[in-house]
Curated annotation (Swiss-Prot):
Highest taxon, organism lineage: Bacteria
GO molecular function, one term: inorganic triphosphate phosphatase activity
Catalytic activity: triphosphate + H2O = phosphate + diphosphate
Alphabetical keyword list: Hydrolase
Source species: Escherichia coli (strain K12)
PROSITE patterns, per the entry: CHAD, CYTH
Lineage of the species this protein comes from: Bacteria, Pseudomonadati, Pseudomonadota, Gammaproteobacteria, Enterobacterales
Gene3D superfamilies: Hypothetical Protein Pfu-838710-001 (2.40.320.10)
The protein's name in its UniProt record: Inorganic triphosphatase
pH effect on activity, per entry: Optimum pH is 8.5.
Length: 433
């Protein structure tokens, strides 16, 4: 088994030649493009996908390899997941050659081999550079081709930085150097994810407003912080993909996701000092300005401002860059129960909302939209330990007030303000349960 650690970027077609020229200056070992043919397999009931597993056969110059990728972690475009590779003499699956640890119950399901069938394919040329960064070995792969499922297809034009040996920080360091040039967009959608989508008939991707965050029952505050930022980054990347594919309404959700990053930093600000995220927040400001301007989606998402901000957030998360800024007291707090933290801060944010909206504000409602947005975001991040139906019903009145203010509906404003202020809390006031 190998632990695959790689960072993926989508490359703007117009930037390919400039990118190739830059990669040739890095002083690494260059490999000419080779054609890679891949067939991905699945069962009719999506058993593999349901277990977060991906199965493929890759062909290269008459050689074949079967690969099984299993559940891992994706932070931004940084993929960290185990993979199992088996050499084959011909392009035919042989699941019995995979180790038993691959399978959920420690053994190959009896009927799986007879149920898997080709689902989609990728056909692309891979050009590689092997470079050394601070003693770590990194493979840079430029892939160009297409992914295809039945009558549907879409182009592949992406860059992958894979850590062959050494430290993940070296991958991030190299990535920072590369994104200083325009044309790269950190992407979380793998070739396989795009293939699965095409195989489903290429349905339109829908806008997904942020929902309540759920974390493990025994999570500590640091795990809550990580989960909140990962949610914000996932929302950012998902809606950026929609925006660049032509859904103009997704732009608002991209900006909302960046705001969620800021609101997360504020929520945990009593533990993580502002100086820990100064550089990150500066890059977010530059990114927001670029996105909010009148430039096209393509220009905005492939800009250096967006690429650097998203990469900085990924690096901040992966390296836990807040830790060097924590004193002994903060170290104790961040190791405490996230459930207790959530109860305390739910009460604080609810009290703030009531203090602001306890009385009609006349023409001053719009002035309070930023505060209302921040409080709603914070409650979305904190409410996951409670009945989701009850918590969402509580939130909907405040979300309704937000929408009414944003759209100038005076009657609706007062309706939702009264409803929101008169509802009972769904959490424990004491912070204990």
């Amino acid at each position: 088994m190998a632990q695959e650690i790689e960072l993926k970027f989508i490359v703007n077609h117009s930037a390919v030649e400039a990118l190739r020229d830059h990669l040739n200056t890095l002083g690494g070992e260059h490999h000419d493009p080779v054609q890679l043919l891949n067939i991905y397999y699945e069962t009719p009931d999506n058993w593999l996908r349901g277990h977060d597993m991906g199965l493929r056969i890759r062909g290269e110059n008459g050689r074949y390899e079967m690969t099984m990728k299993v559940a891992g972690r994706v932070t931004g475009g940084l993929h960290q997941r185990p993979e199992y590779n088996v050499a084959l003499s011909e392009p035919t699956l042989d699941l019995a050659q995979l180790p038993t640890e691959v399978w959920p119950n420690g053994e190959l399901p009896a009927d799986l081999a007879s149920r898997v069938q080709p689902l989609f394919s990728t056909d692309f040329y891979r050009e590689k550079w092997l470079v050394a960064v601070d003693g770590s070995q990194i493979e840079i792969a430029l892939d160009q081709g297409e992914v295809k499922a039945g009558e549907f297809a879409e182009p592949i034009c992406e860059l992958e930085l894979e850590l062959l040996s050494g430290d993940t920080r070296a991958v991030l360091k190299l990535a920072n150097q590369l994104v200083s040039q325009t044309g790269l967009r950190q992407g979380s959608l793998s070739k396989a994810a795009r293939g699965y989508h095409l195989a489903q008939g290429n349905p339109a991707r829908e806008i997904k407003p942020t929902t309540i965050l759920h974390v493990a029952a025994k999570a500590d505050v640091e795990q809550g912080l990580e989960a909140a930022l990962e949610l914000a980054l996932a929302q950012w990347q998902y809606h950026e993909e929609l925006w660049v594919r032509g859904n103009d309404a997704a732009k608002e959700q991209v900006l909302a996701a960046i705001s969620l990053v800021r609101h997360t930093l504020m929520l945990f600000g009593g533990i993580v000092p502002r100086k820990a995220s100064t550089h990150l927040r500066d890059l977010l400001t530059q990114c927001e300005a670029t996105i909010a301007s009148a430039v096209s989606a393509v220009t905005a998402v492939y800009s250096t401002e967006t690429a650097m901000a998203k990469l900085a957030l990924t690096e901040w998360l992966v390296s836990k860059a807040w830790q060097p800024f924590l004193d002994a007291k903060a170290q104790g707090k961040i190791s405490d129960s996230f459930k207790r933290f959530a109860d305390i801060h739910l009460s604080r944010h609810a009290a703030e909302l009531k203090s602001v909206f306890c009385q009609p504000l006349g023409d001053r409602y719009r002035d309070q939209l930023p505060r209302l947005t921040r409080d709603i975001d914070s409650i979305l991040l904190l409410a996951g330990y409670y009945d989701p139906v009850v918590a969402q019903a509580w939130l909907e009145n405040w979300q309704g007030l937000h929408h009414a203010i944003a759209t100038g509906q005076r009657i609706e404003i007062e309706h939702f303000r009264n409803e929101a202020n008169n509802q009972e809390p769904f959490w424990l006031h004491s912070g204990k349960r």
